[in-house]
Amino acid sequence: MKKETPISLRHLRRITAILLLCPISLSSIQASVASDQSDVSSAPVCQEQTSGILRAEKINPTTVDVLFTNQQRMTIDFYGENIFRVFQDNSGGVIRDPEAKPEAQILVDQPRRKVSGLSVDEKDGYITLTTAQVRIELNKQTGLMKVFNPLTGKCVIEEVAPVVFGPKEVTVTLKENPEEYFYGGGVQNGRFSHKGKVIAIENQNSWTDGGVASPAPFYWSTNGYGMMWYTFRKGEYDFGATEKNIVKLSHNSSYLDIFYMVNDGAVSLLNDFYQLTGNPVLLPKFGFYEGHLNAYNRDYWKEDEKGILFEDGKRYKESQKDNGGIKESLNGEKNNYQFSARAVIDRYKNHDMPLGWLLPNDGYGAGYGQTETLDGNIANLKSLGDYARKNGVEIGLWTQSDLHPKEGVSALLQRDIVKEVRDAGVRVLKTDVAWVGA
């Protein structure tokens, strides 16, 4: 990695993908590879569509069982006055959580809120499900669904085609209004408004423009609703790109499992989403300040008239190979201070630039120490951490590799997340490229 000009600091790198944890919690790691209990390969070869409705029955205070004329069943389960779940498995599977490998969960332990009254009525060819904040109309002849906000009288969701159960995916088709806009889908690099676009709900392990780094099967609409597909499987959301005024949602699953939430505005809809999945991480105070990422335990610096100007008035050129120059280190203890991570902290301070956090190993093969043991390297990292904290800066690491020690790996590239956090005081993780999603 290229390093900054020490005096001007004009080459500070911007951060686009980090995970800040204080303290770090390994229980919040999102599963990157998962599969549902019903394998897609077991899905029917031919496509199936939802048919007309025979009847609907309230089976408990929050749940309605819908029976179609082809004997397929759909469950509508309310998780609050304005949040409901639509589940349909034509192979006969019961309502369940999606399977994840490694094990993970999407919903919080207590995702439900009180539903004061759920009524089911049938009139003029429609079955109507009503709470204080949602009205669902099911067309008995077509099986199509409309969802209304009774507080405004507005139709916020309208199916325009039956749900399609294909051999490899399930597809939902909704109406798009001309003035309707869509936001969400997780980290869609460089994209936040999706009208007229197709977005991928999958980890593409990409951190460049247009890639997907950390997807979420959730979006919200300015029409007054949000949607979360309850799955870990890959998906694709088409917001009028293929067909104008049509939204097509699909996931590589053999069954349908969607949460809909009806509310007005981004804040309310996001709070509904948080009711199901939990509140987002609140960044620590230092996380709102600038961060600095680079490698300070790998490269050599040799005098070169075309190199970078340093404080001693000389110019140096950087090399990852031993070019006979001075090798850098975290703490500048080898007569190499100006090439150290400590020097970076001091430069920010000398230029009156607030620095919140520093990652000293952000480069392939860098590591964070030059001793023969992992414990020795962690002690070296702790020394930097102590110095950084005295100057109001927290330290972190690029994950790069596994989080725990492995036999046969050199001390330079060994990791021990427990000791890094507990002993060295690491408070930041950058998780791109390796480990997460790799």
Stretch-by-stretch model annotation:
Residues K3-T16:
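Bacterial N-terminal signal peptides that target proteins for export
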Residues A31-H292, G324-K327, N331, Q338-S340, ...:
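N-terminal accessory segment at the very beginning of proteins
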Residues T69, G211-V212, W220, H251, ...:
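Active-site-proximal structural scaffolding
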Residues A100-L107, P150, W357-A438:
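Aromatic- and carboxylate-enriched substrate-binding clefts and catalytic-loop regions
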Residues D272-N335, P354-L355, D362:
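An acidic-aromatic substrate-binding cleft motif
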Residues L276, R347-N350, Y387, E420:
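A generic secondary-structure signal
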Residues S340-N361:
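Catalytic domains of carbohydrate-active enzymes, especially glycoside hydrolases
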